[in-house]
Amino acid sequence: MDTVVFEDVVVDFTLEEWALLNPAQRKLYRDVMLETFKHLASVDNEAQLKASGSISQQDTSGEKLSLKQKIEKFTRKNIWASLLGKNWEEHSVKDKHNTKERHLSRNPRVERPCKSSKGNKRGRTFRKTRNCNRHLRKNCCTSVRRYECSQCGKLFTHSSSLIRHKRAHSGQKLYKCKECGKAFSRPSYLQTHEKTHSGEKPYACQSCGKTFLRSHSLTEHVRTHTGEKPYECGQCGKGFSCPKSFRAHVMMHAGGRPYECKHCGKAFRCQKSFRVHMIMHAGGRPYECKQCGKAYCWATSFQRHVRIHNGEKPYKCGKCGKAFGWPSSLHKHARTHAKKKPVSGGSVGKSSARPRPSTDVKSQTREKVYKCETCGKTYGWSSSLHKHERKHTGEKPVNAASVGKPSGGLCSSKNVRTQIGQKPSKCEKCGKAFSCPKAFQGHVRSHTGKKSCTSK
């Protein structure tokens, strides 16, 4: 019978196959291979191990190694890559659990129980001694928090954490942006802010390709594709995909306004409204244009202003390719491609001098969720559905539009009163009633003999 070596029983994966395995399956693969080596080592057949070139049967002193020593040397030395194929070396870059020196060689968890300062053993174990020491320095097990904030009483484990916390009370901001001058209390906040100037957005959506500056913004955006709404209101059952919208909704039920101005006492339900109010008190506009000197409160407004100077036009028409610097300009341009042009309420059918909002463009992109139960036709607006349902019911609303006259003003009120037969203006002398005040005034002058105007 031929000698069985480790290469005869090892299972090798290609790069494509290894990428399809999840972390649990990879861990299972490592455990099975380690268990296989244990069985071969327990047979204590020198030919089996020497044939694979895996490990020496004797140490440097010439003494024969025990089974436990063989396994320990196998797991600690960089032998996984040579025994289990090239994929162990190639996959080590993609494996998120790799180490600096041993790419995919996962050592078995060495039992190094955590000990607190009192000597009480804890259940957590560490693979490396330095990780255990780092854990002890954090005082996680002893829960010793020696640094207390004098203002709010909050406790901290490290003095540096207390110093960062005190900046929130004092408003101290040491880290300043070189481009716009805005200051921050933490360097991580400054690094995130600097990306707004460079335009870097490292987090991209795989569904639509939209990029984001922060990871949580990408997470909230992905929920718009999946329809996930993990934040549900306990009172009305309404779901939200964003925690900020959920908190604002809860405040509406509670009627509370947590953001209160210290200067005037005015309270706000939304943090953004509160920030705008505080800027009005401070009178500061941190975003100033270097070319014309105009200042803005918000970075988005400042960025839109900069486009005027550099001629940037990011809003492009999908039909003709024409670009615009403002989204409102793009909406107005898109109406020229639409079949229907917005008209005023006048009876002559002339277009209004001031264009109305782009309802034609919005109606093309808006999701049609309102469905007619009679014919099944869908609409994007509830008002459009109500108007459509009147065709089935035969209902005719009492308004000025039913008589073909423009709505609004005194004439509109007269037309409505004429339809319903209402005549509120009554003459005290003859008892005649009128629906229009102007006609009533002319009738009163007929009794007095006065004329509204004289001819020369």
From Swiss-Prot:
Residues 343-352 have a biased composition (Low complexity). Residues 4-77 form the KRAB domain. A zinc finger (C2H2-type) spans 147-169, 175-197, 203-225, 231-253, 259-281, 287-309, 315-337, 370-392, 425-447. The keyword Cytoplasm does not apply. GO terms for biological process: regulation of transcription by RNA polymerase II. PROSITE patterns: KRAB (PS50805), ZINC_FINGER_C2H2_1 (PS00028), ZINC_FINGER_C2H2_2 (PS50157). The keyword Protease does not apply. Residues 93-114 have a biased composition (Basic and acidic residues). GO terms for cellular component: nucleus. Residues 93-125, 331-365, 386-406 are annotated as: Disordered. May be involved in transcriptional regulation. This is Zinc finger protein 556. It comes from Homo sapiens.
